[in-house]
Amino acid sequence: MYIPPGFIVITCEPVNEEAFRAWATNNGGVWQQSRITWEFPSGCEIVAYLETPTEKQAADWTPRMHAPPQSVIYVVIEEYASSDDEQWTPLIRALLTQWDSYAYDSTVLEWISALLRDVLPPERIIRYEPPPLSAGPAWIWVDSKYTKNEAYQQ
């Protein structure tokens, strides 16, 4: 099954690095030089890192958001893994509700939803724009201007 090469999470509010680090290490990640790595016996590896957007990124993204973006989380999926890989289950089992999971391995979307639920402020709203099948990364917009239902309908 296809797994996207990565995601970008964008939020209008700063993400607390300590909360990000604590979430990652509590869920089996290894923290090193502001990057978190998860390795699976299947050979799949996920790397996530937190940055402040550059001026150009902020200028590019601001028109889509009600305020300039403050934090960006890049998530890179290094390898493919099948959806029946049991090694994924303990780490990334999480609430998965209304994701548009066409062509995506649902375990990766569960992992991303856990990141959003546990690290970002709960009132931030998700807008998710999947990439073409052969391209990436996907975009996950986090913007309080939209309600959850409106966001999914856009």
Residue positions per predicted region:
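Conserved aromatic-histidine-acidic binding/catalytic patches
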Residues: 79-83
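Glycine-rich, often proline-containing surface loops adjacent to acidic residues and nearby aromatics
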Residues: 1-6, 66-78
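Hydrophobic, Leu/Ile/Phe/Ala-enriched alpha-helical segments that form helix-helix packing faces
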Residues: 20-31, 65, 92-99
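Short, extreme N-terminal segment that most often corresponds to the first beta-strand
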Residues: 1-37, 148-154
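Acidic, proline/glycine-rich low-complexity IDRs
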Residues: 1-4, 90-154
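Well-ordered, non-membrane alpha-helical segments in soluble/globular domains
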Residues: 84-90
